[in-house]
Amino acid sequence: MPRSRINGNFIDKTFSIVANILLRIIPTTSGEKEAFTYYRDGMSAQSEGNYAEALQNYYEATRPEIDPYDRSYILYNIGLIHTSNGEHTKALEYYFRALERNPFLPQAFNNMAVICHYRGEQAILQGDSEIAEAWSDQAAEYWKQAIALTPGNYIEAHNWLKITRRFE
């Protein structure tokens, strides 16, 4: 049974109803409909914390989805799940892939910066200041890109860049 029929959350139900109506009235190919159905089910599973199910749906959504913009959001969401699961290398890979298709995803740059910052903090705890500095520099570059795309957002990152003298 499609996830949209079993979800009990009011907002998810409303989203599913609206999405189903739009799929019926907007001219789309069968591949686009299939991709969207998997994407919608992935979002629903992800919102409930069912990450394995969400990943399965997102991977299925990538097969028929050919639009680079839509595909970027699928890849971004896969990156989010890998981040939540602590699989940072995989997460970075999917954020990169999302940005290859849509370079205007500030949230992907932000999440990549957060991972790099975390790795820098871990390197400090391990006593490796050189590696920590490299990770922090990389985090700074990603945060600068996120901020450039959405000035006024990512205030904490902006402050961190100023405090660490990495903001130009």
UniProtKB/Swiss-Prot annotation:
Q: Where in the cell is it found?
A: Plastid, Chloroplast thylakoid membrane
**What Pfam families would the database entry show?**
TPR_1
Query: Keywords on this record?
Result: Chloroplast, Membrane, Photosynthesis, Plastid, Repeat, Thylakoid, TPR repeat
Please report the residue spans annotated as repeat (TPR). 35-68, 72-105, 120-153
What SUPFAM superfamilies would the database entry show?
TPR-like (SSF48452)
Matching PROSITE patterns: TPR, TPR_REGION
Q: What is its main location?
A: plastid
Domain of life according to the entry: Eukaryota
Q: What is one Gene Ontology biological process annotated in the Swiss-Prot or TrEMBL record?
A: photosynthesis
State the disulfide connectivity: none
Task: Write down the InterPro entries for this protein, in alphabetical order.
Answer: PSI_Ycf3_assembly, TPR-like_helical_dom_sf, TPR_rpt, Ycf3/AcsC/BcsC/TPR_MFPF
Q: Is Plastid tagged as a keyword?
A: yes
A GO CC term attached to the entry: chloroplast thylakoid membrane
How does the protein associate with the membrane? Answer: Peripheral membrane protein
Q: Explain the purpose of this protein.
A: Essential for the assembly of the photosystem I (PSI) complex. May act as a chaperone-like factor to guide the assembly of the PSI subunits.
Q: Which NCBIfam families match?
A: PRK02603.1
Family, as annotated: Belongs to the Ycf3 family.
What is the protein named? Photosystem I assembly protein Ycf3
Which organism's genome codes for this protein? Lemna minor (Common duckweed)
Q: What is the name of the gene encoding this protein?
A: ycf3
